[in-house]
Amino acid sequence: GSTGLIPFGRT
């Protein structure tokens, strides 16, 4: 659920 460098499903 993060949209930093890599959109992972974690914070």
Curated annotation (Swiss-Prot):
<keyword id="KW-0527">Neuropeptide</keyword>
<dbReference type="GO" id="GO:0005576">
    <property type="term" value="C:extracellular region"/>
</dbReference>
<feature type="modified residue" description="Threonine amide">
    <location>
        <position position="11"/>
    </location>
</feature>
<comment type="similarity">
    <text>Belongs to the periviscerokinin family.</text>
</comment>
<keyword id="KW-0964">Secreted</keyword>
<dbReference type="Pfam" id="PF08259">
    <property type="entry name" value="Periviscerokin"/>
</dbReference>
<keyword id="KW-0027">Amidation</keyword>
<dbReference type="GO" id="GO:0007218">
    <property type="term" value="P:neuropeptide signaling pathway"/>
</dbReference>
<dbReference type="InterPro" id="IPR013231">
    <property type="entry name" value="Periviscerokinin"/>
</dbReference>
<comment type="function">
    <text>Mediates visceral muscle contractile activity (myotropic activity).</text>
</comment>
<protein>
    <recommendedName>
        <fullName>Periviscerokinin-1</fullName>
    </recommendedName>
</protein>
